[in-house]
């Protein structure tokens, strides 16, 4: 077998009959499979051992040679080679066809490649191939021309003979008629008898004339057809064809079926054809030119790569190895067989019958029919169902052909090449493990024993617990006591991977250090649940074991959960306290007024009370019951850093550990601050979830990961501890219904009655009434909510849970205790009947029924959304999978300008709300300079939180940053343009697969995006697409529904308004031609935008618009934006529009991820004029290739090609990728492979998918060449240590530890990797 690491590209082409015979180990002559009595393969059949190899290792068919010592001998009795049985997986056979057949992919695919090559319409081609018409393959023009006059004379003679014969017949008949009439007259017959005889005679004369005329016409037709006869001409009339061959057989040849196609191809001059097509393109117009372009694509493909078009017509069919189409015996003696065997059998049967018919010299019509059936059976083998009805097996099920084995989710590509099952893995239910550290997981003993079995066995032998591996295996299987100690030893320091399906982003697989636990459930650390999206209601997770040293190192350094605290999408921490932990910490840091032992300042008659010299003293008071953790106290602190303002006041030189200061706080807050790093400023406020998030964020920004990991672990422990002691529970008695509710409802009932009355009187129409009712009940619901809020005490558990941010929101509380309010029907419109009850009071039957609408729609939506979102992710991954960080800096000067703040009229600055997702974590492309010209942040700096704060303080409103969109790296991107990796908070590493990270970051929140298209408060307008469909629409670059026109020029607007449509005319500033937008529907409203005076109002007559500005509400068509504004603007437009959707759902994704995808959509150029280059006009080509070709041509003094940037949807862009392996495994497998084979495409194996398919290491991360090819030169000490002979009393045999032996996160910040760059 060939090793995948020894080739750099994979080429696909057309196989000729010789290739097929060369691969083959013998011809399959019989349709038999195996002998049903002996169960041995039949000789010369589809499973023949002579052709495909022996079924048993080192054993021939007849049993003469058995044993490995006869290796390579070919048995002289049965002809079987003595070798391994696994050759039956790789040896092919072939079937020699008695008549050539065409390959259905090239004839039937759209467009028909065979049709384009031969310039035949697919309909005609079908007639020829399936024996419904003859085609002229060649004409001897010269001979015909030379002998034309002779032939014409002969024809004239023949015609004259016919005419003479006719005249003679007529004459004879006329004479007979005259004689008959004379006779009748003599007999004195009646006149009607005479008339009858006369009519009869005339009728016969007419028939003679007609017959002669028909014969003359036929001769004319034969002559005309012959004189105009040309190759590739179809003759459907069989009689005509036979006449032609009888008369003029030596002047032309014709045939039907695939043979004729083969003959046409033999005479086909590719170079001449290509030249004439190029000429047509240069001079032609319209349809003719288009057709020539399409044909040239196919012709040029054959011309360029020396592929022979003869490969599209087969003389021999390959037979794939028998192990790939197995036949197995089921219990009960029946056989299950692969469909391919049935298809092959049909081909062989028909082929053998055809051979016999030809030998017998059967009539042509019978032979042709058999040839047609052979053609059909080969079609079914290659692609069943592509033409006509598919061949069905038992139970009317279409048989799976070779094409079906490659296609779709169950096909070879997606099922076996892109996803394989692996060993050293297991799965089990997960339960929570609150005692674990962040980098640990609990692994059930039995599971660990099975996973680590080989390691345990080896160790048992090393320690002499067992004599050999076999007995060690027995020990493990019987679970002897010493096995467990060995298992503990083996497991230490060996990380395992945990994965929860669906793996929507890269945090769906993380590494942990296993801790052995009793039971059969995997224990999971509570903080990683968010990343896995796991809960403990029966979820299962899979465990995988990294085996090699490299795999373990990668797992420990890159995948350990404590190194993956930040989200790769937004760079914000994912491992942060939730639910109970939040409640506990919130409880701990709340201040309770009037609690026991609270601080009282000194008065005239009493000293101050509740002052403590240290937190320890306060803790003693709590233990004695004199104080609670939530009472306000005054305490002296020495181990905790004061807040910034206090520090500046008390310790101008800076606080040192041990410096004392006092503050008014609660003991709970002091305890909370003890969980944070010692030099973190003291925080004296309650801690809801939002606040906790900002703290962890800040820690991630300013401290090493190892500290963050330890801190969140401490927060988790404290959170659970105090949640238990807070006594937060929910009971019916906590759900308080506000007493004012009845009065509020009465007031609004009255208002709604009024509306009803007006409606009854006819003062309002249906729509107005509904709108009014909706408005009234929305107000009522709000008012009940306010009353509810006021009515709840602060220590109510439900309010505590909501306020702390643990879970739930106020709307849910209102639903429980206040009123549910208005609900929507499945179309998304409000039902004007409110639900007046709360769940605490219980709903009426009607209310319950109305409520089920929305609830049920929610469930249906979620199910649909999950599938849609998964498919979107798949397309995104496919389009961006080869975007890998390839170099450190591409050196470009370009960048994009992003706003970071907005100047207010009073001169103050408001921070832009989207800085987090647009500017943060990028590299500056130019110095950021303030109003006085001072450089605040230098070019090339990384914009973290501190840098952004500095910019805002200096009053800078926008900065120029590097972006993926402007990166000039040929394949992939450079690290500087990409900026910081969101997941590590440092500049992205070379080899990082940023394309896949981007796809996952966009796809993972897809499920949260809403499905429905929004109605504007029940207004019957054009729906505005929102949510997931809008994201798909943008990435697929579709023309949006209800698209809004954009201004093509800057100028003044003239707005004309009739009853149904708007007409907008723009008068350009530069005095060019006016631009008119006609028939704009009134249902799309005019767009609101800022005018020169700073006010916002609708577009109106006389306004001034800038180029590219939207004129109506709705979405602009990205293709128009590209045409009017150019590629840069359309990129910005797409990024902004996608972000709009995600932001509206509160999802935070960094712009750079969307930019990576958008960059892939704009990578190609359509060639308008090819100049002196090789490009074909109208073809798509990579921008980099296009520019390189132009530079080359210009350097040689030629004419460069001109092109237009084109925006491709992600599906189209994936299919247009350079890698045919990647495209074929994505969609439309057969079409991609057909094209690739004709073009003789070569896959350079640059992206990830191609390498996964052929089984190489992917060229990303540590698989990239610069890391694969490192060689380490050991230092003298290292060499001495490596080659030392250890003695037994050395520490050599004590378990060596990596880092401290806690196995905590590796402090990567302490290692410099700069030498490897």
Swiss-Prot record:
Zn(2+) 1 binds at residues 60, 62, 75, 78. It holds the Pfam family RNA_pol_Rpb1_5. One of its GO terms (molecular function) is DNA binding. CDD domains: RNAP_beta'_C (cd02655), RNAP_beta'_N (cd01609). GO terms for cellular component: DNA-directed RNA polymerase complex. The gene is rpoC. Its EC number is 2.7.7.6. It catalyses: RNA(n) + a ribonucleoside 5'-triphosphate = RNA(n+1) + diphosphate. Binds 1 Mg(2+) ion per subunit. Its cofactor is Mg(2+); Zn(2+). Keywords: DNA-directed RNA polymerase, Magnesium, Metal-binding, Nucleotidyltransferase, Transcription, Transferase, Zinc. Mg(2+) binds at residues 535, 537, 539. DNA-dependent RNA polymerase catalyzes the transcription of DNA into RNA using the four ribonucleoside triphosphates as substrates. This is DNA-directed RNA polymerase subunit beta'. It comes from Nocardia farcinica (strain IFM 10152). Zn(2+) 2 binds at residues 890, 967, 974, 977.
């Amino acid at each position: 077998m060939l090793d995948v690491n020894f080739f750099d590209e994979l080429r696909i082409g057309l196989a000729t009959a010789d290739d097929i015979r060369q691969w083959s180990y013998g011809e399959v002559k019989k349709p038999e499979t195996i002998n049903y009595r002996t169960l041995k393969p039949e000789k010369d059949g589809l499973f023949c051992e002579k052709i495909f190899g022996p079924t048993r290792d080192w054993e021939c068919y007849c049993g003469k040679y058995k044993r490995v010592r006869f290796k390579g001998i070919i048995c002289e009795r049965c002809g079987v080679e003595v070798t391994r049985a696994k050759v039956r997986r790789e040896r092919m056979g072939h079937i020699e066809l008695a008549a050539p057949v065409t390959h259905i992919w090239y004839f039937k695919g759209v467009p028909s490649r065979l049709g384009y090559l031969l310039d035949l319409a697919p309909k005609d081609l079908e007639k020829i191939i399936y024996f419904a018409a003859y085609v002229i393959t060649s004409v001897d023009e010269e001979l015909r021309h030379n002998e034309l006059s002779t032939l014409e004379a002969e024809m004239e003679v023949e015609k004259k003979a016919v005419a003479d014969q006719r005249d003679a017949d007529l004459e004879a008949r006329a004479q007979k008629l005259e004689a008959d009439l004379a006779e009748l007259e003599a007999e004195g017959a009646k006149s009607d008898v005479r008339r009858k005889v006369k009519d009869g005679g005339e009728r016969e004369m007419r028939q003679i004339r007609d017959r002669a005329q028909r014969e003359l016409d036929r001769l004319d037709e034969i002559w005309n057809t012959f004189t105009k006869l040309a190759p590739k001409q179809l003759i459907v009339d069989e009689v005509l064809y036979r006449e032609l061959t009888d008369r003029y057989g030596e002047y032309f040849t014709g045939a039907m079926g695939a043979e004729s196609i083969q003959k046409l191809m033999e005479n086909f001059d590719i170079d001449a054809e290509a030249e004439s097509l190029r000429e047509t393109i240069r001079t032609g117009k319209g349809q003719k030119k288009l057709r020539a372009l399409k044909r040239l694509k196919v012709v040029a493909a054959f011309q360029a790569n020396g592929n022979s078009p003869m490969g599209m017509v087969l003389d021999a069919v390959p037979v794939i190895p028998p192990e790939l189409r197995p036949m197995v015996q089921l219990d009960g003696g029946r056989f299950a067989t692969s469909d391919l065997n049935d298809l092959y059998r049909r081909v062989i049967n028909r082929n053998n019958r055809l051979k016999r018919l030809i030998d017998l010299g059967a009539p042509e019509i019978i032979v042709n029919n058999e040839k047609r059936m052979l053609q059909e059976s080969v079609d079914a083998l290659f692609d069943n169902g592509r033409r006509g009805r598919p061949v069905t097996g038992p139970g009317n099920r279409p048989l799976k052909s070779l094409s079906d084995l490659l296609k779709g989710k169950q096909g070879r590509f997606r099922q076996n090449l892109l996803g394989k099952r692996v060993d050293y893995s297991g799965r089990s239910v997960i339960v929570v493990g609150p005692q674990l550290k962040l980098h640990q997981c609990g692994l059930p003993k039995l599971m660990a024993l099975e996973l680590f079995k080989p390691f345990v066995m080896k160790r048992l032998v090393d320690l002499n617990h067992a004599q050999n591996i076999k007995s060690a295996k027995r020990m493990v299987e019987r679970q002897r006591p010493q096995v467990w100690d060995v298992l503990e030893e083996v497991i230490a320091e060996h990380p395992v991977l945990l994965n929860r399906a669906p793996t929507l982003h890269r945090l769906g697989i993380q590494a942990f250090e296993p801790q052995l636990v009793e039971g059969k459930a995997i224990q999971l650390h509570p903080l990683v649940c968010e990343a896995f999206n796991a809960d403990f209601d029966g979820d299962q997770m899979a465990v995988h074991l990294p085996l090699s040293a490299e795999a373990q190192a990668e797992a420990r350094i890159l995948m350990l959960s404590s190194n993956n605290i930040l989200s790769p999408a937004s760079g914000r921490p994912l491992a942060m306290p939730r639910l109970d932990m939040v409640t506990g910490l919130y409880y701990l840091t709340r201040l309770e007024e009037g609690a026991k032992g609270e601080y009282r300042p000194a008065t005239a008659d009493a000293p101050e009370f509740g002052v403590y010299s240290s937190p320890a003293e306060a803790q003693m008071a709590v233990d004695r019951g004199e104080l609670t953790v939530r009472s306000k106290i005054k305490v002296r602190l020495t181990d905790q850093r004061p807040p910034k303002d206090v520090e500046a006041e008390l310790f101008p030189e800076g606080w040192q550990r041990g410096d004392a200061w006092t503050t008014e706080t609660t003991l709970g807050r002091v305890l909370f601050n003890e969980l944070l790093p010692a030099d973190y400023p003291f925080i004296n406020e309650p801690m809801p979830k939002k606040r906790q998030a900002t703290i962890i964020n800040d820690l991630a920004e300013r401290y090493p990961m190892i500290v963050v990991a330890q801190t969140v672990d401490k927060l988790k422990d404290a959170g659970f501890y105090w949640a238990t002691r807070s006594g937060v529970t929910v009971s019916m008695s906590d759900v308080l219904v506000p007493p004012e509710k009845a009065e509020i409802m009465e007031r609004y009932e009255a208002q709604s009655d009024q509306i009803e009355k007006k409606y009854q009187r006819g003062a309002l129409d249906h729509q107005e009434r509904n709108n009014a009712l909706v408005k009234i009940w929305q107000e009522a619901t709000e008012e009940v909510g306010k009353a509810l809020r006021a009515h709840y005490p602060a220590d109510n558990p439900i309010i505590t849970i909501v306020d702390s941010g643990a879970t739930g929101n106020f709307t849910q509380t209102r639903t429980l205790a206040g009123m549910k309010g208005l609900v929507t029907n499945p179309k998304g419109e409000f039902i004007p009947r409110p639900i007046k009850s709360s769940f605490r009071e219980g709903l009426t039957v009607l209310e319950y029924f109305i409520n089920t609408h929305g609830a049920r729609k929610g469930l249906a939506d979620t199910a649909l959304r999950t599938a849609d979102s998964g498919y979107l992710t798949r397309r995104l991954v496919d389009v961006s999978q080869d975007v890998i960080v390839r170099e450190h800096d591409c050196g470009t000067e370009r960048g994009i300008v992003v706003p970071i703040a907005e100047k207010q009229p009073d001169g103050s600055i408001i921070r832009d709300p989207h800085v987090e997702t647009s500017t943060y974590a990028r590299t500056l492309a130019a110095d950021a300079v303030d109003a006085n010209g001072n450089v605040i942040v230098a070019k090339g700096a990384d914009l973290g939180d501190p840098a952004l704060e500095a910019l805002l303080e200096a009053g800078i409103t926008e900065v120029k940053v590097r972006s993926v969109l402007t990166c000039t790296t040929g394949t992939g991107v450079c690290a500087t343009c990409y900026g910081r990796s969101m997941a590590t908070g440092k500049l992205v590493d070379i080899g990082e697969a940023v394309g896949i990270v981007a796809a996952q970051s966009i796809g993972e929140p897809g499920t949260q995006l809403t499905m429905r298209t929004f109605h504007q408060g029940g207004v019957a307008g054009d729906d505005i697409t929102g949510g997931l469909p809008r994201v798909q629409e943008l990435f697929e670059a579709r023309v949006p529904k209800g698209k809004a026109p954009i201004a093509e020029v800057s100028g003044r607007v003239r707005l004309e308004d009739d009853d149904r449509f708007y007409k907008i005319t723009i008068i350009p500033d530069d005095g060019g031609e006016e631009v008119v937008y006609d028939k704009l529907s009134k249902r799309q409203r005019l767009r609101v935008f800022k005018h020169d005076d700073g006010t916002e109002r609708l577009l109106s007559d006389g306004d001034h618009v800038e180029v590219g500005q939207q004129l109506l509400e709705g979405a602009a068509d990205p293709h128009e934006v590209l045409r009017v504004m150019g590629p840069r603007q359309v990129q910005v437009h797409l990024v902004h529009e996608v972000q709009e959707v995600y932001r509206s759902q509160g999802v935070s994704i960094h712009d750079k991820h969307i930019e990576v995808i958008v960059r892939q959509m704009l990578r190609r150029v359509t060639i308008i004029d090819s100049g002196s280059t090789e490009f074909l006009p109208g073809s798509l080509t990579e921008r980099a290739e296009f520019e390189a070709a132009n530079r080359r041509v210009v350097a040689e003094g030629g004419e460069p090609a001109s092109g237009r940037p084109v925006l491709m949807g992600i599906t189209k862009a994936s299919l247009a990728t350079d890698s045919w392996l990647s495209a074929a495994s994505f969609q439309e497998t057969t079409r991609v492979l057909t094209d690739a084979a004709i073009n003789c495409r070569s896959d350079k194996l640059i992206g990830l998918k191609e390498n996964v398919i052929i089984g190489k290491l992917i060229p990303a991360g540590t698989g990239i060449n610069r890391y694969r090819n490192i060689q380490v030169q050991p230092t003298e000490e290292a060499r001495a240590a490596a080659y030392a002979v250890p003695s037994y009393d050395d520490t050599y045999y004590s378990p060596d530890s990596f880092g401290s032996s806690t196995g905590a996160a590796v402090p990567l910040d302490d290692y410099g990797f700069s030498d490897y760059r």
